[in-house]
Regions:
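His/Asp/Glu-enriched, well-ordered alpha-helical/loop segment
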Residues: 1-63
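C-terminal cap of metal-dependent C-N hydrolases
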Residues: 35-37, 57-91
């Protein structure tokens, strides 16, 4: 999320995606890609994480939305239905 206690204390991924869509004019899929794969690539960890592929590490959040369009426009609610961390269902 670009969380930085000194300049940006926003911890909501959905809110950051909303800002990307509304103010940076990104497509929703582009905002999600820029929040997952691109950071992994910048950190040189894209071979092991950043996308859902066989053999990669993944922490996955499943949102309870009927369409990708809902993600940036319902940022005030918590749509998280399931959380998978290191292969374990934790929520």
């Amino acid at each position: 999320t670009d969380y930085n206690p000194g300049s940006c204390n926003i911890q909501s991924m959905i809110f950051i995606i909303m800002l990307s869509v509304l103010y940076m004019k990104m497509e929703i899929s582009q905002a999600i890609y820029s929040s997952t794969y691109i950071p992994a690539k910048v950190l040189n960890r894209h071979e092991e994480s950043g996308s859902i592929e066989v053999g990669k590490l993944a922490d996955i959040i499943i949102w309870d939305v009927s369409s990708i369009i809902e993600i940036p426009y319902n940022f005030s609610i918590n749509p998280i239905r399931t959380v998978i961390k290191s292969g374990n269902f934790v929520f």
